[in-house]
């Protein structure tokens, strides 16, 4: 019996990415697709490359209950939570790719996203970063899929934080992301003429992913961590490269040894040998993350570099990895593809 899957928000970039990967997943049958903008039309007519002749509909909780074992919600922040609440008592698993289920402390969501999450404590949700919370994910029904920047930053810093090897509790992050991270916004800033041939910082210091990153770092480190974050938009479709600066007394060899051991058994996380630096092209279209490091012995500063595909490990691929865990499948099921060049 295949897993019956629904995708809410199927025509956005993360929804389409879910569709691209799930249609080739050997244990999945796609049974429900929703889209407010294209309700009543066939997915195949809107996006012929999808090769799925399913009628798109507006979100219908009764239809979801009747036709799905797991639902991916690829919706704007603030919309998913009401759906999760309405399905809370059903024998259904929900993986939210938005921000609504990411926070342990709902007051952070309220402060940064401007909405109160009523009865949040009744939703037994788990932060869906498998490399750190695998056992918790397996026992849950509600998964808050991490943001793209948090995934790239947390995986790159977790070994140091977990071992309490950070000095001074401060981390500086410079991240560069492809334009698909902004979704399908019809704004001048994301138009071809504005993006092409240009590099632009945005939401410096006050990006909405900062509280998510800091909350998770505190959970891993068992102490407050301050993140100074400067994201940049680069003229490419997909991919994130994060360069992270932090103080640690580990030597270069100790740093490499720590990371190699920490991620030794992880299929999707690759620790590169010294002096090898990753390219976003390596992770393009795949669920793989590449991490490299360099130690500045003069200043006791470690420079960590991570790359991933913001639409895959930063969103839809990680969501499928979480689904595989929930249903006791191999984590790489349906996720073994890569694209190069």
Swiss-Prot record:
Segments traversing the membrane: none
CDD domains: AGPR_1_C (cd23934), AGPR_1_N (cd17895)
InterPro entries membership: AGPR_type-1, NAD(P)-bd_dom_sf, NAGSA_dehydrogenase, Semialdehyde_DH_NAD-bd
Biological or metabolic pathway of the protein: Amino-acid biosynthesis; L-arginine biosynthesis; N(2)-acetyl-L-ornithine from L-glutamate: step 3/4
One Gene Ontology cellular component annotation held by this UniProt entry: cytoplasm
Catalytic activity from the UniProt record: N-acetyl-L-glutamate 5-semialdehyde + phosphate + NADP(+) = N-acetyl-L-glutamyl 5-phosphate + NADPH + H(+)
Keyword check for Cytoplasm: yes
Molecular function terms, GO-annotated: N-acetyl-gamma-glutamyl-phosphate reductase activity; NAD binding; NADP+ binding
Gene3D superfamilies: Dihydrodipicolinate Reductase, domain 2, NAD(P)-binding Rossmann-like Domain
Subcellular compartments: Cytoplasm
EC number of this enzyme: 1.2.1.38
Record-level GO BP terms: L-arginine biosynthetic process
Top enzyme category: oxidoreductase
HAMAP family for the chain: ArgC_type1
Role this protein plays: Catalyzes the NADPH-dependent reduction of N-acetyl-5-glutamyl phosphate to yield N-acetyl-L-glutamate 5-semialdehyde.
Protein family according to the UniProt entry: Belongs to the NAGSA dehydrogenase family. Type 1 subfamily.
Protein name (Swiss-Prot/TrEMBL): N-acetyl-gamma-glutamyl-phosphate reductase
Species, as recorded: Pseudothermotoga lettingae (strain ATCC BAA-301 / DSM 14385 / NBRC 107922 / TMO) (Thermotoga lettingae)
